[in-house]
Amino acid sequence: MKKILLIILAVVVVAAGATMVILSTNKPTVVQRDKIEDALFCYLNIDQLAKKGAFDKYITSEQRKMWASMATANVENQDIATHIESIITNFNNSGIDFTKPVYGYLDNYKNFVFVAEVADAIAVDNSINTLSYLIELDGEEPIEISQIDDERSFDIGENVFGLYNSKRFTIVMGENEMLATSVSEAAHRNLADCSIFGNSDIATYINANKIKDLLYESELVDNDVDDAVAQDLSQYLGEDAHIISSLTFEPGRIVATNNCYNFNTEKFEGLFKRCNNDHLDYISEDAIAVLNFGLEGQILSELITEFINSDLSNILGIDLHNEERMALAVACDAIESINGDTTIVLESIDGTLRERFNYYTGDVNYLPEMKSFKAAMMMDVSDSYIITNVGQYAMGLLVKVDDNHYASQFGNYNITLLQRENLLFGGVNMKPTKAEYPASKAIWAKDIEESYGYAIINFNSLRESKFTGSIYDILIEELGLEYDNTLRSLKQMLSYAYTTSEDILCNKSVVVLNDESTNSLEQFTSILIPVIISEMSASIF
């Protein structure tokens, strides 16, 4: 296991280091590429990440030479030391062509395969020999390279097998007897066609049917429950059902997407509705957090009832007693009233910083103490069923003000529950009055148009609030972190974050930074790299 961790660490270090400096290569590459048909496929565009991170701007050649000297201080073999130094100063000297994307996949033998294109096979030889030397220094068996014509192979323990030639480098990790077969197939099959990932920096592809088969194959299915779940999942998976997830660093934004293709969703047709966003008029534009989704309650109620009465529910052991079925029926009746947007909002939090004297140190600390908050839940409803029943079963906690209008007060919290036409409103220190500066005009409003559902976190509001903004600084001081200015800089970077679904089977999550002109990865690089350099330099001297 120690050897496996070493090889994984070596791959990660080489890949991460390559993002610091990438040089072009004129080596030929395989032109023909195969469609991705693996159960799981992972993609990493190191060249693109390196350029977006602008690492060369923040890491000088002198600093890399200094790190190389530090890394080889205890290496007596001069050839090994020279090769380590050459890799640190230029990571393409490892022999791997990091100007090309690298990827990994789960093959038919349930082994994970790592694939990269080769720039210089001789340099890869030197890199493997260097790794072997370092492993031997650690008291482990060295790595031996076997070569037949242009192909070299090696193994590390029983669970890691590698093979490479002048075109590509492959490593297989697994726990079965098919490692050699896996790596041989990986080395000779065409490279994967990664065009489906577009301009993504990091991405994954999941073949839903193959993953399902791997999870529920015959030797793993040891009871009726697993088999029933597998069969139930099958009805939703089309012939080429797959999921593509990606992470991309853009100017001022970090974008993560998750898209599902060829799934059978006819059963849920009409369940979700596009949000009309009318509720945003009752919310302030500087609200801390907003959750909104469009729903057809009648269909949801039918789906719940269908599931409770299904064979799958019976196999799963969901056996409701009479009282539970009555409660579920009441809940479904309430759900059926929902007909459109449901919105939950946390508009603000108010509090004070209470002084706390430490008698042992003589220091005065400040403890955040929440006094109140403003929050609400709004629903588009088709009738007055919900508010009528809430009023009926409130048991004196709510006082009737008028028809379909209830209120109460607990300390600093004023509770309002009322319905106006088709709007059901429940608020804590909030009422259904139009905001002077509504959330429909907020900086994030343009990002959630034509959505089936979305969630927003407004970092600007959290930071600018006297109470919530001070909590972050207090936490830093309490933790006694050395680089508190760095953490404060990271705090200043964030503007807002949102996740939205413009299609029922597609989701996009975005972190928006206040500087929208500079690539988001470079913004993090500019803050974090100087800290890392300072820390590493300090460890040398």
Language model features: what each stretch is:
Residues 104, 160-165, 231-252, 342-346, ...:
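Broad, structure-driven detector of short, well-ordered beta-strand segments within folded domains
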Residues 6, 15-152, 196-238, 254-365, ...:
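Structural boundary/hinge residues at secondary-structure and domain interfaces
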